[in-house]
């Protein structure tokens, strides 16, 4: 699977800094991204798939800058992204046409046939000619996932993939992800979906607050959230809680273990 490397990445939106000197090397087959809204999770995924370019620094795939010719080709062939909102991603009016979009090397008729065969294999033959506009939000999200699966990139970037799904939909997606042989980089607020991952990054206002094994990083983030809630409910205890928060950060900082990145 590809090696993704972010070197001294800076990103600003307007006057708001998103990342300042971000350094990461992403090699594990399962990587979770957690943190509050606005922490930088979606921005990181958009940088990795080339939808945004850093103001400073570089992003490489297997040693090639993704914004140079060789790296751009590698990125387009090896990285796919599923957006949080499927309406930001879907282009075509029917399911089969949307799936065929992920097969650019084939003639239209061949691509549509492969899309129909793929849907049939998954018991969804009746979806082929369904109008996207007739699908629920969760069903449209499932179409985006199926399009990625059929296209077959080596690395899948998933931004809040469970957000629009009902419980059966979440179970189906989790089953697919568990069986996948691709590299998965998953941003989520549902920590149980990444808790067992070999690597989880906790982002906080564009900084890597913690970087390590899934169980440890998820537990540290949950403890931090509990402290924030308790502090809001009992302001008089804030000094004690602030001290506890500092001890949590010390136990799980981004540099607290042999780093995964250079």
Residue ranges, per PLM feature:
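Conserved ABC ATPase "signature" region
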Residues: 109-127
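Conserved beta-strand-loop-alpha-helix hinge in the C-terminal portion
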Residues: 207-230
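Conserved ABC ATPase signature
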Residues: 131-135
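Conserved structural motif at the start of ABC-family nucleotide-binding domains
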Residues: 4, 18-21
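Helix-to-loop junction immediately C-terminal to a conserved catalytic motif
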Residues: 49
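ABC ATPase NBD coupling module
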Residues: 65-80, 105
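Catalytic Walker B motif of ABC-type/P-loop ATPase nucleotide-binding domains
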Residues: 156-160
């Amino acid at each position: 699977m590809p090696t993704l490397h972010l070197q001294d990445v800076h990103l600003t939106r307007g006057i708001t800094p998103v990342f300042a000197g971000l350094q990461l090397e992403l090699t594990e087959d399962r990587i979770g991204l957690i943190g509050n809204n606005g922490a930088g999770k979606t921005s990181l995924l958009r940088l990795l798939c080339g939808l945004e370019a850093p103001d400073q620094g570089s992003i490489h795939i297997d040693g090639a800058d993704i914004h140079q010719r060789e790296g751009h080709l590698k990125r387009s062939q090896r990285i796919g992204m599923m957006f949080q909102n499927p309406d930001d991603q879907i282009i075509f009016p029917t399911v089969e046409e949307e799936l065929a979009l992920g097969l650019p090397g084939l003639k239209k008729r061949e691509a549509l046939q492969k899309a129909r065969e793929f849907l049939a294999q998954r018991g969804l033959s009746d979806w082929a000619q369904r109008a996207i506009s007739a699908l629920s939000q969760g069903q449209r999200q499932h179409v985006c996932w199926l399009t990625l699966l059929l296209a077959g990139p080596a690395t899948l970037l998933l931004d809040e993939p469970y957000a629009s799904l009902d419980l059966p939909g979440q179970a189906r997606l989790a089953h697919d992800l568990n069986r996948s042989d691709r590299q998965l980089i998953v941003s989520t607020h549902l920590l149980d979906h990444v808790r067992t991952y070999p690597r989880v990054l906790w982002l906080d206002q564009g900084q890597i607050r913690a970087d390590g094994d899934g169980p440890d990083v998820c537990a540290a983030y949950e403890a931090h959230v509990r402290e924030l809630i308790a502090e809001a409910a009992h302001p008089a205890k804030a000094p004690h809680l602030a001290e506890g928060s500092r001890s949590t950060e010390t136990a799980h900082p981004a540099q607290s273990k042999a780093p995964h990145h250079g």
